[in-house]
């Protein structure tokens, strides 16, 4: 698809890669919209956000646990891990939920990803070779997340999170 960037009060350009559009919107204090004029990403986010009611699921790989946890939170009535074991990607697995549109982003900073949490969307972030976390909350100084390999709820300073995702 194509993404349109508005910043500094005017149209800044269009991009085919969402990551590029987010970077341009970030640099111009703007917003990214899709071809249907739906907001996809906003530079401005609230100073804190929290998504409650997320119950960690264990039993698979770190990624399977993360995707299953998010799918269950979103109301999936199927076994997400089973689909992933059949070769479905995380995004394909989430997109089977009615009204859900998962996206995959590579190379964006933690700060940019937090805009999604601020809009009420959980973020699965890769933190190592086979390690994933689910970001559930943030404030001005730290993020809260579920470590999907252990199910533990933890916090990390915004500074450390910035280093982890850079």
Give the positions of each predicted feature.
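Short, mixed-charge low-complexity intrinsically disordered segments
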Residues: 29-45
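Residue-level detector of conserved, well-ordered beta-strand and adjacent loop positions
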Residues: 6, 16, 33, 136, ...
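Solvent-exposed strand-loop boundary residues in beta-sheet-rich modules
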Residues: 9, 36, 149-151
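A short, charged, amphipathic alpha-helix used as a generic interaction element across diverse proteins
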Residues: 15-34
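Conserved active-site-adjacent core of cysteine acyl-enzyme catalytic domains
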Residues: 46-166
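Surface-exposed loop/edge segments in extracytoplasmic proteins
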Residues: 10-14, 41, 152-155
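Short aromatic-glycine-(Arg/Gly/Cys) micro-motifs in beta-strand/loop hairpins
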Residues: 1-10, 30-31
